[in-house]
């Protein structure tokens, strides 16, 4: 089995014009898409495409829900890069818990045929309250990191996420290839100056019946917690009189 659980912390830091910082513990599922249909047969409270306390629902993730996620993701990469992934595809994400799912960011790692290195990373972003989605497809040819176990991609913001960050932003994303740990670090630059960063520091846990029970009890409302903290931090920024930027579509209307 290649699927597993990753547990650790997420940290956000805003440097200007009103400093703000928070950090909290969380867990993610790391899912080999080929293993999905039978992955949760080991636990009665977890399921695939069936109502349960914890469940994977195809419609919560990228693409047409009538097309298998594995196929949809490979089609996306081929359409963007001209090369179809020919190895495993593994997804770092949240599932649906107690009927609720929200993923600020999910990461698809597309491995080579030998399953030894990540060739392409797809970052799927969701926003709230607009419930929109957008994918950044990051090919190996644009990797700027000198280490074979890390990736670095610099690219322009294309999708509205936060009303407290303007659209004219450059991203600097660094990711470590998943192994015993996962590291993700994203920096937002505005006019060449650091505005914000976000970091994930996660450690691998074996996916078994006991571990699935433990994370349900330790993080009983994982995705609800994510959304609640998003709005709590938004309130803090409002109270600090942080500048507000409307959704670009609303500006145009």
Residue ranges of model-derived segments:
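Mature, function-bearing regions of proteins
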Residues: 1-253
């Amino acid at each position: 089995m290649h699927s597993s659980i990753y547990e650790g912390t997420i940290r956000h830091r805003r440097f200007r014009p009103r400093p703000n910082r928070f950090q909290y513990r969380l867990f993610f599922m790391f899912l080999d898409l080929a293993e999905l249909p039978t992955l949760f047969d080991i636990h009665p409270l977890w399921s695939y495409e069936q109502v349960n306390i914890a469940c994977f629902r195809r419609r919560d993730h990228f693409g047409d829900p009538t097309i298998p996620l594995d196929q949809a993701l490979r089609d996306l990469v081929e359409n963007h890069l001209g090369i179809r992934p020919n190895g495993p595809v593994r997804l770092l994400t949240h599932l649906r818990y107690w009927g609720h799912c929200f993923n600020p960011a999910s990461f698809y790692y597309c491995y080579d045929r030998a399953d030894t290195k990540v060739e392409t990373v797809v970052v799927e972003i969701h926003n709230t309250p607009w419930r929109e989605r957008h994918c950044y497809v990051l090919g190996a040819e644009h990797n700027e990191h000198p280490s074979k176990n890390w990736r670095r991609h610099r690219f322009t913001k294309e999708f509205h996420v936060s009303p407290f960050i303007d659209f004219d932003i450059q991203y600097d994303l660094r990711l470590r290839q998943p192994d015993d740990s996962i590291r993700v670090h994203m920096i937002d630059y505005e006019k060449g100056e650091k505005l914000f960063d976000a970091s994930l520091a996660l450690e691998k846990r074996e996916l078994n019946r006991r571990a699935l029970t433990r994370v349900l009890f330790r993080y009983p409302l994982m995705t609800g917690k994510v959304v609640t903290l998003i709005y709590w931090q938004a309130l803090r920024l409002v109270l600090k009189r942080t500048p507000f930027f409307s959704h670009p579509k609303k500006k145009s209307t």
